[in-house]
Amino acid sequence: MKPMHIAMALLSAAMFFVLAGVFMGVQLELDGTKLVVDTASDVRWQWVFIGTAVVFFFQLLRPAFQKGLKSVSGPKFILPAIDGSTVKQKLFLVALLVLAVAWPFMVSRGTVDIATLTMIYIILGLGLNVVVGLSGLLVLGYGGFYAIGAYTFALLNHYYGLGFWTCLPIAGLMAAAAGFLLGFPVLRLRGDYLAIVTLGFGEIVRILLLNNTEITGGPNGISQIPKPTLFGLEFSRTAREGGWDTFSNFFGLKYDPSDRVIFLYLVALLLVVLSLFVINRLLRMPLGRAWEALREDEIACRSLGLSPRRIKLTAFTISAAFAGFAGTLFAARQGFVSPESFTFAESAFVLAIVVLGGMGSQFAVILAAILLVVSRELMRDFNEYSMLMLGGLMVLMMIWRPQGLLPMTRPQLKLKNGAAKGEQA
């Protein structure tokens, strides 16, 4: 152990102790008209000391960690991709699908509800992966399309009484239209400028929903959004006025409130499977190759006779449609929508799913969505520090595997050693 490593560990621990002591060790209290600085509870100081110790030992043992991670990180370490190209992978995917269908009947109602939320984020991640991972366009306002889909279902049901299955394609079309219209002003923008424009779009949508109280309800939102039905059969104790019948009464079963949660999960699973099927089919079409060409080099893409303008428009439109479908499912799960559900934090969370999983890989998006959504739900008890913990996890992930958990495998052509030597000679 070199003295320099010990000194760096002590310095890092001291800096952490000072910063954590300021943000967590003290608290402001209102005494009449004055703010009084007071020390925090002993529990918070315990966490400060624990964090200081963790930082010290991490910095002290960091060289050993780096040596150990070299074998399992970096571009040379590529986890096997699962794209269904072989018979074994197809059998594995079928087994996963069967397990996913049977799983909700063996767990609790709350677990199934969390799984449904995970499915929603998987659809969002797959949609954003089209424009960010496959096309190489940075979008920070994806929550705007998400909100359009959710409010389309909520408004059509509130004012016209339309159901889930009727509103699902309409919400997708509305979000796709918004993506198509957004594509025109951002066609010539790239990089940070494109990200800023899309960020502004997401905030504009949220503010419009917040201020238009006569139609959207403003901050109060829209409530009493119905759940999806099975060919008109409702998963409730009694059918609504004008409804056909309930699921339990039609089949002569005992009413179980878990049936509604399980059915919503199966609907979400169906939408995930359809999303994967559509995206994989698009990737095998010339459109998918055009997305990859745009991501690699826009100038080379134009020189090949491809139109970057049309490619961007298709990417924005298709990506927004998936967000609209996810928004409809979110509104059905919650039974209530409000503008506060579609802040920039939601867009950042979906972007984190795509980046941490591995841009361009569908299976990576699924894995990252499961890890991040479940981690966020488990950290509900640390509500004040959940985003801090999530940010720390992202930083560690970027240090360990900046290319993501399962980066997309790209075809490569390499010359053999003999051929390369012959050309050099």
Curated annotation (Swiss-Prot):
GO terms for biological process: branched-chain amino acid transport; isoleucine transmembrane transport; L-valine transmembrane transport; phenylalanine transport. Part of the binding-protein-dependent transport system for branched-chain amino acids. Probably responsible for the translocation of the substrates across the membrane. Keywords: Amino-acid transport, Cell inner membrane, Cell membrane, Membrane, Transmembrane, Transmembrane helix, Transport. InterPro entries: ABC_transp_permease, LivHM_N, LivM-like. GO terms for molecular function: branched-chain amino acid transmembrane transporter activity; L-isoleucine transmembrane transporter activity; L-leucine transmembrane transporter activity; L-phenylalanine transmembrane transporter activity; L-valine transmembrane transporter activity. NCBIfam families: PRK11301.1. Coiled coil: none annotated. GO terms for cellular component: ATP-binding cassette (ABC) transporter complex, substrate-binding subunit-containing; membrane; plasma membrane. Belongs to the binding-protein-dependent transport system permease family. LivHM subfamily. Pfam families: BPD_transp_2 (PF02653), DUF3382 (PF11862). This is High-affinity branched-chain amino acid transport system permease protein LivM. The chain crosses the membrane at residues 6-26, 45-65, 92-112, 120-140, 145-165, 167-187, 191-211, 260-280, 311-331, 353-373, 387-407. It is found in: Cell inner membrane. It is a multi-pass membrane protein. It comes from Escherichia coli (strain K12).
